[in-house]
Amino acid sequence: GVGKTDREVVEALDTGVLMVNVESEEELDLLHSVAGKLGKKAPVALRVNPDVMVDTPHPYTRTGVKGMKFGIPFDETLLVAERALAMDNISLIGLDMHVGSQISHFEPYEIGLGRLIQLKNEIQGAGARELEDLDIGGGLAVSYDSEHPIDVAAFGEVVRNIVLPTGMKVIVEPGRFLVGNAGILLTRVLYRKRSGGKEFIIVDAGMNDLIRPSHYNAYHRIEGVIPSEQRTTADIVGPVCESGDFLGLHRDVDDVKPGDLVAVLSAGAYGFVMSSNYNSRTRLAEVLVDDGKFGVVTERETYED
């Protein structure tokens, strides 16, 4: 991330990470200083902001366009690279980018990769040894509703055709793509309520458990665990004391009753890890299900905890 601390840098170098993705000149200076004190040579990739506009579901998930906090501006990267090459405790081995999240087409990657390879050639022309690693980040889209997920094989072919002639090793970070659809938030209906001509289904999970709908206006499919023959249109809301506490608004859902279980789908990414104790609420348990077997991997939090 853009805010690495001294301690985090020490831990990374002591652990022997493949490389540290440097986001700014100041961070490069810190890394050089820490590596010198440890008697190490820090492996570094420069995270480049390639200034690629991406059509993402929410502007918060655009990370590779000019004016964002992420990465070194494209037109400043060569100068930063030249500084890195002159540092005794820095080994510049690669370049890195991450242009956004929920990307469903190839063009942003093609543009970004083209700019990184241009930089690679300029940096090597400035005296660098052959750069080895090209980290293209993540951001591959998954299907939350009826969207078509990105074609991974076709994506791989696009990347291969661009990168293969350079001889660089490609690193991909497909976090959400791997786990997004693997998680389900299970919640129980507490009450049904009608107010102002609207129907509300009040459940025992709230924005502190899954903040994506409130924070990003993100869509998650919501279904009764036991399907109902009847349907209703309702807001599915939680117990937190603000109007932004919802899991879905104006949804056509199963006509569930108090005590029924409801499944909020595609909650495997940016779900539990973004949960909090807001409103003095305890965090949920996590249960791993595999081939008909299950086990608790994170115990339900208690007030004593």
Regions found by a protein language model. Give the residues of each.
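Short glycine/threonine-rich loop-to-helix capping motif typified by GTGT followed
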Residues: H105-G112, S143-F155, N181-Y191, L249-D252
